[in-house]
Design a protein with these regions (language model features):
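Intrinsically disordered, polar/acidic, low-complexity terminal segments
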Residues: 1-63, 137-279, 341-461
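Hydrophobic residues within the alpha-helical transmembrane core of Major Facilitator Superfamily
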Residues: 19-22, 95, 120, 294, ...
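Membrane-interface micro-motifs in multi-pass membrane enzymes
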Residues: 49-99, 123-128, 289-330
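Hydrophobic cores of alpha-helical transmembrane segments in multi-pass inner/ER membrane proteins
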Residues: 85-94, 131-135, 167-170, 244-252, ...
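Hydrophobic alpha-helical transmembrane segments and adjacent interfacial helices
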Residues: 92-94, 110-122, 140-141, 291
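Membrane-interface alpha helices of multi-pass inner-membrane proteins
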Residues: 104-126, 167-170
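Transmembrane-embedded, aromatic-rich helix segments that form part
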Residues: 126-142
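Charge-enriched interaction surfaces
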Residues: 277-294
Length: 461
């Protein structure tokens, strides 16, 4: 898909990937915002979208999305990793719509749709294994945030979730049996192998902490230090993008402060108050962060590699969404306590200023991470390889140049058991070029070498 789009537009593949990444992050933001606002809406908070916590949530989420590594969901494998989280967010919002949070009979097609959705979630990716408990937590959070928690088991959303779980298990159980059988013979995708040891608790805690912004900033600072690149605080004043961002922050501050007086009395006068929705949203955020962290903590691959705190992994993007929900719950508490109009305005201004600063740090950390990539030989070679695929030279000299690039890439990543190694990338590029151009990316006959075999591949992330 990326190659076809790059060929059609004449853009380099990494530029197309950048556009795709922005689209996916936008969809993630919409889904996360929908999750947060649905919980508060159940409590009668922010139904008009004017509550400061609702207004500030985009800034909260933006501040948490620290890339944290070259192979994080934000920088690599976007469609699979971010797409899996988007799918789970969409599933939760579909299972527990406003009209499903009451007692009613299900239409004939609803069980069928939920069974199908559950099967899709089980067959998509390892990360979506947490979908049933995640959706259940969302249903409970919505019910607990309102005044209908006692009627939870009678709600249509609970029955819809039951069908979703049944469809999920119908695919999940036989799939995991087959995976376990293959892993017992050392012929499975390594990251799918589960191992229950005492190390699970430590790895889960590390993965949970990694989703917090300070951990991402700290890890990125270490990468920059090793690459000899300054974090660049002095560049903030000269960064046009950040100036525009700060102007937007100032605008949001004004809106939040103006809305504080009109919205906060709604919270204090509502029979539910602010404590229950804040607790429900905080609990949902904790579950959202803990489930993927535990899933990856159980992975034998994670226990072997032992990624550092702050080093983004496949689950990090969902953990970050969980942290954003917990931070928003804290904002609901702050604005619930600050009931006087003057105090509410000050609280809104301070919250926006703090979020603006953290968002600027996250943006700067992510921007500096791209500079680390640019100074590494691997990034330069990868860019040249992608450009050579788009602007394909079918001559013998073109083949020689592409083969030299493959050799240089393989010298950096020689292990054929890794997915992104030189031999495996060579095979994939050959397959792509044969389908598009009719000739391989690097002809081993003309190059004077033999194409390596493609052994079992380990997980790259």
């Amino acid at each position: 898909m990326v190659y076809d789009a790059a060929e059609a537009t004449g853009l380099a593949p990494h530029a197309v990937n950048g556009v795709l990444r922005l689209v996916l992050i936008g969809m993630l933001a919409v889904g996360s915002f929908g999750l947060m606002s649905a919980v508060l809406r159940s409590a009668g908070i922010g139904r008009s979208g004017r509550h400061p916590a609702v207004v500030l949530y985009p800034m909260v989420l933006a501040a948490t999305l620290v890339a944290g590594d070259h192979y994080s969901p934000i920088t690599s494998y976007n469609v699979v990793l971010i797409g899996s989280v988007i799918l789970m967010l969409a599933a939760a919002l579909w299972v527990a719509r406003d009209k499903d949070m009451v007692q009613r009979r299900l239409a004939w097609h609803e069980p069928v749709a939920m069974l199908g959705l559950g099967a899709v979630l089980a067959a998509t990716y390892d990360l979506t294994y947490v979908a049933p408990p995640f959706v259940a937590a969302f249903v409970v959070a919505r019910a607990a945030a309102g005044s209908s928690a006692r009627q939870l088991l009678r709600m249509a959303s609970v029955r819809r979730w039951t069908y979703l779980t049944a469809g999920f298990l119908a695919v999940f159980i036989p799939a995991r049996i087959e995976i376990a059988r293959r892993c017992s013979g050392s012929s499975c995708y390594v990251a799918s192998d589960v191992e229950l040891t005492t190390d699970v608790f430590g790895r889960t805690a590390d993965r949970l902490l990694t989703g917090a912004s300070p951990a991402g900033w700290r890890y990125t600072a270490g990468l920059l230090d090793r690459a000899g690149i300054s974090f660049g605080f002095a560049d903030l004043a000269r960064n046009v993008l950040l100036i525009v961002l700060l102007a937007a922050v100032a605008f949001i501050t004004v809106i939040a402060a103006r809305n504080a007086r009109g919205s906060l009395p709604v919270v204090s006068e509502d029979s539910v108050g602010w404590r229950r929705p804040a607790a429900s949203l905080g609990a949902l955020g904790a579950v959202t962060a803990l489930l993927p962290a535990l899933l990856v903590g159980l992975s034998r691959r994670t226990q072997e590699v032992r990624p550092q705190v702050g080093e983004a992994w496949r689950e990090t993007i969902m953990v970050q969404v969980g942290w954003s929900l917990m931070a928003t719950a804290a904002l609901v508490c702050v604005f619930g306590i600050a009931r006087k109009p003057g105090t509410a305005r000050i609280a809104a201004a301070l919250a926006t200023a703090i979020l603006g600063a953290t968002m600027a740090l996250t943006l700067l950390a992510n921007a500096r991470l791209t500079q680390v990539d640019r100074v590494t030989p691997l990034h330069a070679i990868t860019s040249e390889m992608a450009t050579a695929a788009i602007h394909f030279d079918p001559t013998e000299s073109g083949n020689a140049r592409r083969c030299r690039l493959i050799d240089d890439y393989t010298a950096i990543l020689p292990n054929p058991r890794q997915w992104v190694s030189g031999p495996n990338v060579w095979s994939e590029l050959d397959e792509l070029m044969l389908s598009v151009q009719g000739i391989p990316y690097c002809d081993p006959v003309l190059h004077g070498g033999n194409k390596p075999a493609n052994p079992e591949i380990e997980d790259a992330s």
